[in-house]
Design a protein with these regions (language model features):
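Exposed, low-structure sequence patches enriched in small/polar residues
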Residues: 58-59, 63-277
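Surface-exposed coil loops of outer-membrane beta-barrel proteins
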Residues: 1-57, 66-102, 178-180
């Protein structure tokens, strides 16, 4: 995740056939809860573990489908430590969610990704995700290159819908987070998001425009933390606009002179309007 803290991990990529590939990753995460008893100078944070199995199938030259199987595993609590369950190392997608039924030890996430290239210029993509097969979220979007005959131009639109119950485990210590930061999205859950992007390059000049609109619905900033007394529920809208204009002196080393303007409007904040140059 680009949003949470760095964490140690091991991973491997395996090409099973010309159409089938597999990604295996295991990581050690932290809850920002210190153990109450320690023999060291500083108490350790509570550890937990993350497993990811990602299977990708290229059905045709245009259609690609991927199955995501992720899980957060208990390694103890604030007092005791224990080895992670042996099923943590299992590489077979979906098996963990079936074989491990103890919600106090394991939190399961299952997702399905798909992308379809209509042509070299137009690509649609989407994603579905569910936690313990109880509730889910989805993403839909497309990218269009060289639209209207404009060379070196790209437009992208994307929509994300993530209910407030997604990524939250019945055992709060196993929620989908690391270091009190969400793994999947900067807002965690409880939001709708619309993303628009346009960029165009002419010779050495370029322009890049980004627009993001969040609609927060029953959102809690700390709901993915291992422990929180903050029960404040937030609803509202956040708008983010960014404009960048630049000139590339050397494309090989990306030597660029640019200027940018950022505008942010947040009706859930005490500082609703912010501008940056």
């Amino acid at each position: 995740s680009d949003n949470s803290l760095n964490s140690p991990y091991i991973q491997g990529n395996f090409r099973i056939s010309s159409k089938l590939s597999f990604h295996y990753m295991r990581s050690r995460l932290l809850n920002l809860l210190r153990r109450p008893f320690t023999s060291s100078a500083e108490a350790y944070y509570e550890p937990k573990a993350l497993s990811v199995n990602y299977l990708t199938y290229k059905a045709t030259d245009k259609l690609t489908v991927s199955l995501f199987d992720g899980g957060v595993w208990s390694k103890g609590d604030s007092i005791t430590s224990r080895r992670v369950d042996n099923m943590f190392y299992n590489p077979i997608p979906l098996l963990n969610g079936i074989a491990v039924s103890d919600n106090s030890k394991f939190y399961s996430m299952v997702g399905l990704n798909a992308s379809y290239s209509v042509s070299d210029r137009l690509k649609f993509y989407g994603q579905l995700v569910t936690n313990d097969f109880e509730t889910g979220a989805y993403q839909l979007g497309f990218r269009y290159y060289n639209f209207f005959g404009l060379k070196n131009a790209m437009v992208q639109f994307e929509y994300n819908d993530v209910p407030s119950s997604v990524y939250v485990s019945q055992n709060s210590r196993l929620s989908y987070s690391n270091g009190n930061l969400p793994l999947a999205h900067v807002k965690g859950n409880g939001f709708n998001e619309f993303v628009g992007r346009l960029n165009y390059e002419y010779q050495r000049f370029y322009i890049d425009v980004k627009f993001v609109l969040y609609t927060l619905i029953n959102h809690q900033n700390t709901v993915l933390n291992a422990y929180s007394n903050n029960k404040n529920v937030v609803s509202g809208k956040i708008q983010h606009q960014q404009y960048e204009l630049g000139y590339r002196f050397n494309k090989k080393i990306n030597l660029t002179l640019f200027g940018s303007y950022i505008y942010r409007q947040d009706d859930t904040s005490t500082l609703p309007n912010t501008q940056f140059f």
